[in-house]
């Protein structure tokens, strides 16, 4: 990004404070970009093929028999136990949509999904909607896995993994230069469960501590995986 200047050891971030004309500069050892769906507006993520995904969740009032629900019901959608008299019922999945207004058609989609999945239960009659809902945008990746780790320029990846683009195996593991910019993103629909572990992966890597995942799992969330896959697909 144009507001970020990096050297081999340090990073400078320039930004304007709200309603202020003066520019403030922060210098740090490392910058972690955790921008959610806002990452699509940053050129630092251009090579990662990420996309925003809109989701709408209904907040339906509780009543018998769902007032006794004490676990999350999961199928193609989900419904949670009541909190303050309401159940969360969701969620829609609309790719490349950054809008957050509540839509009646998505309410109907959510209700229909649950009515179909729970058709033979007494719960169906309790799925009464009174217009309360919210929508937000999460960030998704092509393989639906989180994206965690250092952000490298595509030209750097291309030079280090050049053998892949001509269909030849790598004779040794490429050594990428240290990056002072990393990301923790694409937590998708299940971020509450993946965020703590992914944060531990990133912090352990930065602090050179033992990593909490196997190599296979680390490769599955590595920031460079989309670029290397593209190089393999483009073999000449």
Regions inferred by a protein language model and the residue ranges of each:
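Short beta-strand segments that buttress and anchor functional surface loops
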Residues: 12-18, 183-186
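C-terminal catalytic lobe of FAD-dependent flavoproteins
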Residues: 126-236
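Central helical "cap/lid" subdomain
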Residues: 15-74, 103-107, 120-126, 213
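A conserved short coil-to-beta-strand element within the FAD-binding core of flavoproteins
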Residues: 1-12
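Active-site lid/adjacent beta-loop-alpha segment flanking the redox-cofactor pocket in flavoenzymes
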Residues: 65-177
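Conserved active-site beta-strand-loop modules that form the wall/rim of enzyme catalytic pockets
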Residues: 9-11, 29-31, 40, 76-80, ...
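Short glycine-/acidic-enriched loop or helix-start segments at secondary-structure transitions
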Residues: 42-45, 98-100, 158, 193
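Short beta-strand micro-motifs in enzyme catalytic cores
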Residues: 9-11, 54-58, 144-146
